[in-house]
């Protein structure tokens, strides 16, 4: 469902070039990730401090991933697939100007209006949907992202997990 620009997570335009897969970025290209985080720190925060730049990157990332995921869960009873393998970033210079899903996959309850959609994973009940939400956030995303940021961009693990907790509570 379209929930507005802050809460919507569009599907990548397959005709548009310049997309990079999140799994590739966070698991295979430490130097590129370090360069992107450093560029963000300089451009938006006016700093070369690795910790501040990594925190700024984390906040921007959380806004584009957690808000749409939680909004879909609360408002539509859906859990969109935000695993790193399904997330894409559109590059612009040394940064990104868009975040999107590679495929429109989501988990939903049996009575969802789009339950018959080919990209829908039907879960039996609300407890299973909530378990899927936690799996998407932690196993499929932050459990891979935070170690990558710590390794390549010198992020603080504690600060990063605190930012995740704060964004989920927002």
Question: Model-predicted segments: where are they?
Answer:
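Hydrophobic, aromatic-lined core segments that form the binding pocket/scaffold
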Residues: 23-170
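A eukaryotic "domain-start" boundary segment
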Residues: 1-35
């Amino acid at each position: 469902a379209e929930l507005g620009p802050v809460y919507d997570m569009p599907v990548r335009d397959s005709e548009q070039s310049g997309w990079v897969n999140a799994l590739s970025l966070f698991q295979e290209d430490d130097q590129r990730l370090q360069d992107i985080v450093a560029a963000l720190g300089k451009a938006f925060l006016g700093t070369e401090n690795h910790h501040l730049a990594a925190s700024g990157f984390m906040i921007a990332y959380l806004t584009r991933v957690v808000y749409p995921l939680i909004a879909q869960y609360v408002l539509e009873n859906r859990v969109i697939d935000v695993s790193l393998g399904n997330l894409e970033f559109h590059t612009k210079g040394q940064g990104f100007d868009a975040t999107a899903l590679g495929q429109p996959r989501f988990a939903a309850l049996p009575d969802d209006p789009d339950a018959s959609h080919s990209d829908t994973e039907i879960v039996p009940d609300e407890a299973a949907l909530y378990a899927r939400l936690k799996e998407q956030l932690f196993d499929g995303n932050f459990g891979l992202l935070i170690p990558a940021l710590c390794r390549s961009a010198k992020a603080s693990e504690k600060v990063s997990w605190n930012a995740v907790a704060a964004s989920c509570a927002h």
